[in-house]
């Protein structure tokens, strides 16, 4: 496979941007080799600058649930862009998308739009503290909530991929108020509440972990967190930047039947454009300026292009049978991956929920980040390179979930499973 142009472009990029990328995981540090430079995307496919075509299971890290460059989304954006790219003023499209989010997500009575998932989590952290008058927060090992200082403690995503314990430049005084517990461990959370009476503002988590690989909540875990937070006067926050509108139209909270106090969102609700949002109970959201004293603002928040793409994407997702199709596609894929690994004699554990999946190259089950570390990262790197050579683009990290879309066909899934079978046979 010729990737000479990708190599040249990435080589030049390293003198222009730190590590040659705008986000660390894209640099292929944990899988080896040089990253592929994309030229265009359409449906379930991506083409690099050398003309190689790939079946894509990253989907821009989650937003492309309808497939890349969906014609109805593109058409809506073409019409909207003629009216301007950013207003910096109230826009009727904000009302439309806000109503759609409020109608869909059980916890959301009011919503504030921002520009990224990180920004949403930063704001919701401040809101938790403002509403409760408490400074401490509980997060879970391996869960990633963006790159804000207080969250870079035993975090997932690129932090996990690069094996970093945290990040230089984060003051100890900032992280002193961040308490951590193993995912799926209610007893550890109980102990933290007991050790910090009347000091914890809330608990924030990915209801399905997607930034330490793919880890599902065990039965009773989310329900237990809901009870513990209520008992201790703390807030429960679901980071649904990844799971929102992907696991179901109402997100993971609708899927599992557990309603948090606050929710952060992003990715899908922007239809591929930069976006984030946080929302929840009206009495809490009324704390946000200008309605209340907790300040948060953004120049490009609620911009008409992101709102337009989000509205059209949610309209497409609301059509009958959408999530049944996504679930069937993803279940077939992960089943085929596990079968192919078994045929090659490799240990594997994994699963899927709706349009989100993942696997670890180790014996299961994997219930938390510590157990996820048992995955064979070196073998995954070889697998990743072998899959690229066979035209399949997976996340360049053993610690990232994968995503399917409405555009992935049965033929795409079959071709992908065959590529896994061939790759497992050659990687050793």
From Swiss-Prot:
Stored SUPFAM superfamilies:
PLP-dependent transferases (SSF53383)
> Which Gene Ontology cellular-component terms appear in the entry?
cytoplasm
The molecular function terms of the Gene Ontology recorded here are:
glutamate-1-semialdehyde 2,1-aminomutase activity; pyridoxal phosphate binding; transaminase activity
Q: Identify the InterPro entries for this entry.
A: 4pyrrol_synth_GluAld_NH2Trfase (IPR004639), Aminotrans_3 (IPR005814), Aminotrans_3_PPA_site (IPR049704), PyrdxlP-dep_Trfase (IPR015424), PyrdxlP-dep_Trfase_major (IPR015421), PyrdxlP-dep_Trfase_small (IPR015422)
Q: Which cofactor does it need?
A: pyridoxal 5'-phosphate
- In the record, N6-(pyridoxal phosphate)lysine modifications are located at 267
Protein name, per record:
Glutamate-1-semialdehyde 2,1-aminomutase
Naturally occurring in which organism (per UniProt): Synechococcus sp. (strain CC9902)
Origin organism lineage: Bacteria, Bacillati, Cyanobacteriota, Cyanophyceae, Synechococcales
């Amino acid at each position: 496979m010729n990737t000479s142009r990708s190599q040249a472009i990435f080589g030049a990029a390293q003198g222009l941007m730190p590590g040659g990328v705008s986000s660390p995981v894209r640099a292929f540090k944990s899988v080896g080799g040089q990253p592929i430079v994309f030229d265009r995307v359409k449906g379930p496919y991506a083409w690099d600058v050398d003309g190689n075509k790939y079946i894509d299971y990253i989907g821009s890290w989650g937003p492309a649930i309808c497939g890349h460059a969906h014609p109805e989304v593109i058409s809506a954006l073409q019409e909207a862009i003629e009216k301007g790219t950013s207003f910096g003023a109230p826009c009727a499209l904000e009302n439309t998308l806000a109503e759609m989010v409020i109608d869909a997500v059980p916890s959301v009575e009011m919503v504030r739009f921002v520009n990224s998932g990180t920004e949403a989590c930063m704001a919701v952290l401040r809101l938790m503290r403002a509403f409760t008058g408490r400074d401490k927060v509980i997060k879970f090992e391996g869960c990633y909530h963006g790159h804000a200082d207080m969250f870079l403690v035993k975090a997932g995503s690129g932090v996990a991929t690069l094996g970093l314990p945290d990040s230089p430049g984060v003051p100890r005084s900032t992280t002193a108020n961040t308490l951590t517990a193993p995912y799926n461990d209610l007893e550890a959370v109980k102990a933290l509440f007991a050790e910090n009476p009347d000091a914890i503002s809330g608990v924030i988590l990915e209801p399905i972990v997607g930034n330490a690989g793919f880890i599902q909540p065990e039965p009773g875990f989310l329900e237990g967190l809901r009870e513990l937070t209520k008992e201790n006067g703390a807030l429960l926050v679901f980071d649904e930047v990844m799971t929102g509108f992907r696991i179901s139209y109402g997100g993971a909270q609708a899927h599992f039947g557990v309603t948090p106090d606050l929710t952060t969102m992003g990715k899908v609700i922007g239809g591929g454009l930069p976006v984030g949002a946080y929302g929840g109970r009206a009495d809490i959201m009324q704390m946000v300026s200008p309605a209340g004293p907790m300040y948060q603002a953004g120049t490009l928040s609620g911009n008409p292009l992101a709102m337009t793409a989000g509205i059209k994407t949610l309209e497409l997702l609301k059509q009958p049978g959408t999530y049944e199709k996504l679930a069937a596609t993803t279940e077939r894929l992960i089943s085929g991956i596990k079968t192919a690994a078994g045929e090659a004699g490799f240990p594997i554990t994994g699963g899927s929920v709706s349009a989100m999946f993942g696997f670890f190259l180790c014996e299961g089950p994997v219930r938390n980040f510590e157990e996820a570390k048992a995955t064979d990262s070196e073998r995954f790197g070889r697998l990743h390179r072998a899959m690229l050579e066979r035209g399949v683009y997976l996340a360049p990290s053993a610690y990232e979930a994968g995503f399917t879309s409405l555009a992935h066909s049965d033929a795409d899934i079959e071709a992908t499973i065959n590529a896994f079978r061939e790759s497992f046979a050659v990687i050793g």
